C-alpha cells in the first residue's frame, strides 16, 4: 500500500526516520519498498553522531526472509540535501548464526555526485569516530565533484583493521580544497 509522511521511531538499536512517502508491498517471506520522499529525518544514534536531514530521498529496495535470516537489497537509492548528493546500491544480510551477535554483513557501493568537503564528516559512521573527528578539524574548504565509496564485510569487524575481514573505501576528487593536517602546520591548498 501507499503511505505519506510515515514516521518510524528508533527502537532496539534499529534506526528511525520521519517524512517517508512511498509504497510497500510484501508478506512474511519478503517484499518491496519504493520511496519518493522529501524532508526526511533519519535517526541512527548507533551509526551516526546526529540525525541526518535529507531533502530528497528516492529508493527502490526489496527484502526476503530465509529461515531465521533476513536480506535487504537496495536496487538504487538517491539521497540529496544542501551538503551532498549520493547514490547507493547493495545488499545487507543478517547473520543470525553469528557467535558474536554481528550487526550483519554488507556489500554497498555508492557514488558522491556532489558534496561540501566540510560536511563529509557528518556522513561518516561512529565506527570511525576518530577519523571523523580529525576530518572535522582538518577539512577547511572544498567541493567534492566526483567520488565513490564501498563498504563490504561483516560489520562486527568494522572499521576492518584486518583487510581480510572487509573493505571500507572512500575516494573523491576535490575542487578548491583546503586541508590542515595538524593545527601546528600551515594549511595545504589545492
Please report, for each region that a protein language model flagged, where it lies by residue.
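Secretory-pathway-linked proteins and extracytosolic
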Residues: 101-103
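Extended amphipathic, helix-rich lipid-handling scaffolds
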Residues: 1-11, 22-30, 34-82, 105-179
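Short, intrinsically disordered, charge-balanced linker/junction segments flanking boundaries
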Residues: 178-190
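Short, surface-exposed coil-to-beta transition loops
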Residues: 20, 85-87
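Short acidic-glycine loop/turn motifs at beta-strand connectors
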Residues: 28, 96-97
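A short acidic (Asp/Glu
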Residues: 11-12, 85, 183-184
Amino acid at each position: 500500500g501507499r503511505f505519506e509522511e510515515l514516521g518510524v521511531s528508533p527502537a532496539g538499536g534499529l534506526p528511525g526516520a520521519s517524512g517517508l512517502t512511498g509504497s510497500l508491498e510484501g508478506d512474511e517471506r519478503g517484499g518491496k519498498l519504493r520511496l519518493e520522499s522529501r524532508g526526511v529525518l533519519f535517526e541512527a544514534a548507533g551509526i551516526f553522531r546526529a540525525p541526518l536531514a535529507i531533502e530528497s530521498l528516492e529508493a527502490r529496495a526489496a527484502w526476503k526472509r530465509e529461515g531465521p535470516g533476513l536480506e535487504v537489497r537496495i536496487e538504487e537509492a538517491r539521497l540529496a540535501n544542501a551538503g551532498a548528493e549520493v547514490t547507493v546500491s547493495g545488499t545487507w544480510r543478517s547473520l543470525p548464526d553469528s557467535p558474536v551477535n554481528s550487526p550483519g554483513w554488507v556489500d554497498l557501493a555508492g557514488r558522491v555526485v556532489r558534496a561540501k568537503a566540510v560536511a563529509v564528516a557528518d556522513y561518516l559512521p561512529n565506527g570511525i569516530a576518530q577519523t571523523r573527528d580529525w576530518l572535522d578539524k582538518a577539512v577547511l574548504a572544498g567541493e567534492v565533484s566526483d567520488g565513490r565509496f564501498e563498504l563490504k564485510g561483516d560489520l562486527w569487524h568494522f572499521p576492518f583493521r584486518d583487510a581480510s575481514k572487509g573493505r571500507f573505501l572512500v575516494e573523491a576528487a576535490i575542487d578548491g580544497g583546503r586541508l590542515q593536517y595538524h593545527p601546528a602546520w600551515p594549511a595545504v591548498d589545492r
